[in-house]
């Protein structure tokens, strides 16, 4: 059973759940439907787990060529490949069924879109054949917070658009940093990521440009009236620091160590933004004016329902 758990990549699921919560609480604006949140979290976790299992199934040949992945479950033959594929499909069906039964069709379609991009477009073709695989794949990585948001709003509004842009832009330097400090692995497996095809210097330039765009997108949540000034300060400071780390790459003597630091801080950055949009959202006042709101209380919600 342990192997069937490991193949779902629990760490990736947990990281995505943080962003799902960010989008969900942002859209809830203090009026949290606990049952809906749990159903959304479990449903999208199953869909993500399905994608991870099927990605492992598809990548088992190239995983054997990379030091980082050569000990994965399917590479070592700890689970039959056919069983893994069936397991992956069942997880996906269960996740979509739960979302269909408890959320709305927009959430279901967004989940299917993210799954199709990751498994169909990225894993099956783009990862092995195109330098643009990271760019297209970023859409699937940006889907979870948008799904969380739309599970509440049932509307693909400006808030959903901004979330999609923020998390898509974040994916790029995050993924490029991995590609740099794992450059030998990607080269050995002939995966055409940007550092392999264009070199590390070109990748550094792309990283800086994407982080600049990310900074602008991140503050748009406040400028568009979705989050308060506390979010703005945290997003601004942490994003600028991340940009500073990226610029430091031009002077580094060790690209692998620098890229690993950039990667680790990218996780801190997106986690901080997800937390802050959860607790420093804005809600429309009765007269139509946007006002800052504090962290919603589940206890208060239960009293309200009762």
UniProtKB/Swiss-Prot annotation:
Listed under catalytic activity are: heme b + (2E,6E)-farnesyl diphosphate + H2O = Fe(II)-heme o + diphosphate
Question: Is Cell membrane included in the keywords of this UniProt record?
Answer: yes
From the record, give the transmembrane residue ranges.
Answer: 5-25, 34-54, 85-105, 106-126, 131-151, 161-181, 207-227, 230-250, 261-281
Q: Does the keyword Cell inner membrane apply?
A: yes
The membrane topology noted for this protein in its Swiss-Prot or TrEMBL record is: Multi-pass membrane protein
Superkingdom is Bacteria
Q: Where in the cell is it found?
A: Cell inner membrane
Q: Which PROSITE patterns match?
A: UBIA
- Which keywords annotate this record? Cell inner membrane, Cell membrane, Heme biosynthesis, Membrane, Transferase, Transmembrane, Transmembrane helix
* Family, as annotated: Belongs to the UbiA prenyltransferase family. Protoheme IX farnesyltransferase subfamily.
Q: What else is known?
A: Carbon 2 of the heme B porphyrin ring is defined according to the Fischer nomenclature.
- Provide the protein name: Protoheme IX farnesyltransferase
Give the originating organism: Methylobacillus flagellatus (strain ATCC 51484 / DSM 6875 / VKM B-1610 / KT)
């Amino acid at each position: 059973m342990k192997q069937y758990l490991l193949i779902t990549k629990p760490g990736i699921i947990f990281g995505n759940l943080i962003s799902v919560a960010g989008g969900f609480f942002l859209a809830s604006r203090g009026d949290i439907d606990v049952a809906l949140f749990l159903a959304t979290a479990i449903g999208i976790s199953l869909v993500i787990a399905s994608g991870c299992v099927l990605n492992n199934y598809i990548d088992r040949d190239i995983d054997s060529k990379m030091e980082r992945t050569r000990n994965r479950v399917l590479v070592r033959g700890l689970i039959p490949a056919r069983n893994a594929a069936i397991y992956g499909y069942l997880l996906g069906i269960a996740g979509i069924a739960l979302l269909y039964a408890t959320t709305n069709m927009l959430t279901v379609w967004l989940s299917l879109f993210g799954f199709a991009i990751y498994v169909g477009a990225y894993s099956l073709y783009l990862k092995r054949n195109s330098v643009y695989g990271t760019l297209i794949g970023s859409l699937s990585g940006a889907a979870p917070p948008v799904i969380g948001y739309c599970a509440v709003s049932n509307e693909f509004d400006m808030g959903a658009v901004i979330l999609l842009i923020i998390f898509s832009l974040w994916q790029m330097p995050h993924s490029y940093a991995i590609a740099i400090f794992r450059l030998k692995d990607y080269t050995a497996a002939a995966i055409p990521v940007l550092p392999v095809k264009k070199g590390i210097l070109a990748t550094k330039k792309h990283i800086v440009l994407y982080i600049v765009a990310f900074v602008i997108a991140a503050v748009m949540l406040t400028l568009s009236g979705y989050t308060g000034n506390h979010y703005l300060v945290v997003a601004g400071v942490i994003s600028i620091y991340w940009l500073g780390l990226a610029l430091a790459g031009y002077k580094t003597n060790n690209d692998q160590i620098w890229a690993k630091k950039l990667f680790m801080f990218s996780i801190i950055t997106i986690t901080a933004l997800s937390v802050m949009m959860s607790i420093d959202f804005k809600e429309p006042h009765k007269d139509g004016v946007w006002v800052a709101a504090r962290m919603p209380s589940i206890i208060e919600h239960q009293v309200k329902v009762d």
